[in-house]
């Protein structure tokens, strides 16, 4: 039976600001990436998100980003590899404390936004992230963009497991990278098209780029975005579609 992980970014609320549909999406995913306070989230939200994830038996991962609350961590920053290492190690440690306090065990780390995209093409950034994971806990998995040589090489260097990731509602360029969110066609807004793309990736191992070329994608986890207007409806549709197609949904080991 084909097996796939469904992951989602949660815990992005902070202070008086509510973001996303965390409670409604949790039943339809197998792993979550929790914001750690730099691009979103705060200590109370981190604790609450961890506790809810454990109640739903969902795997928990840290979602470290750039210290850019105003830009939601989606803006590139001119930072050194050592700064990236510090940012990631700090955020892993913060979330891990809440996970341990709740009696759980953290499973993975997935960089957020601009940090993720920079790491996918910049070996030094990817190396810094992998090193931070290794020094924190070498048993943690690294979620990274499928086919990214930077992620692949960094994971191999530090002997950590890379879980290659694809995106349900994002378009792809010919080189296998995601279309920038600054482009109008970055997101697939039609649910039927997004469902078709996901099934194509999981069952056939490829995706059609924005130019129409087939791009090989051997993903072990699929990312759903939880902050869109119809995020819960979309998550449930993918979940049910996988069930109907005999695809098992579970977190990677």
UniProtKB/Swiss-Prot annotation:
The superkingdom of the source organism is Bacteria
Q: Which Gene3D superfamilies does the record match to this protein?
A: Glycoside hydrolase/deacetylase (3.20.20.370)
Q: Which Pfam families match?
A: LamB_YcsF
Q: Which GO annotations describe the biological process of this protein?
A: carbohydrate metabolic process
Q: From which source organism is this entry?
A: Bacillus cereus (strain ATCC 10987 / NRS 248)
Q: What does the sequence similarity comment in the record state about its family?
A: Belongs to the LamB/PxpA family.
Report the protein name in the record.
5-oxoprolinase subunit A
Function summary: Catalyzes the cleavage of 5-oxoproline to form L-glutamate coupled to the hydrolysis of ATP to ADP and inorganic phosphate.
Enzyme Commission numbers on file: 3.5.2.9
Q: Which gene encodes it?
A: pxpA
Keywords from UniProt, A to Z, are: ATP-binding, Hydrolase, Nucleotide-binding
Q: Which HAMAP family match?
A: PxpA (MF_00691)
Under the heading InterPro entries, the entry gives: Glyco_hydro/deAcase_b/a-brl, LamB/YcsF/PxpA-like
State how it assembles.
Forms a complex composed of PxpA, PxpB and PxpC.
Question: A GO molecular function for this record?
Answer: ATP binding
Q: Which reaction does it catalyse?
A: 5-oxo-L-proline + ATP + 2 H2O = L-glutamate + ADP + phosphate + H(+)
């Amino acid at each position: 039976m084909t097996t796939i992980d469904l992951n989602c970014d949660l815990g992005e609320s902070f202070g008086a600001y509510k973001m996303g549909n965390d409670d409604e999406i949790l039943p339809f995913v197998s792993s979550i990436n929790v914001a750690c306070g730099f691009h979103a989230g705060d200590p109370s939200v981190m604790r609450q998100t961890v506790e809810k994830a454990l109640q739903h038996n969902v795997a928990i991962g840290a979602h470290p980003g750039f210290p850019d609350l105003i830009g939601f961590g989606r803006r590139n920053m001119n930072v050194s590899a050592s700064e990236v290492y510090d940012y990631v190690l700090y955020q892993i440690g913060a979330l891990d404390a809440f996970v341990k306090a709740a009696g759980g065990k953290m499973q993975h780390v997935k960089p957020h936004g601009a940090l993720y995209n920079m790491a996918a093409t910049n070996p030094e950034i990817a190396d810094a992230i992998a090193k931070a994971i290794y020094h924190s806990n070498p048993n943690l998995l690294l979620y990274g963009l499928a086919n990214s040589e930077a992620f692949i090489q960094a994971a191999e260097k530090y002997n950590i497991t890379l879980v290659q990731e694809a995106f349900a509602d994002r378009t792809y360029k010919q080189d296998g990278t995601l279309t920038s969110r600054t482009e109008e066609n970055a997101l697939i807004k039609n649910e039927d098209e997004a469902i078709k793309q996901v099934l194509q990736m999981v069952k056939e191992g490829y995706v059609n780029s924005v130019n129409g070329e087939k791009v090989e994608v051997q993903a072990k986890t699929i990312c759903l975005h939880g902050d869109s207007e119809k995020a819960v409806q979309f998550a449930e549709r993918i979940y049910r579609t996988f069930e109907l197609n005999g695809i098992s949904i579970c977190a990677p080991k």
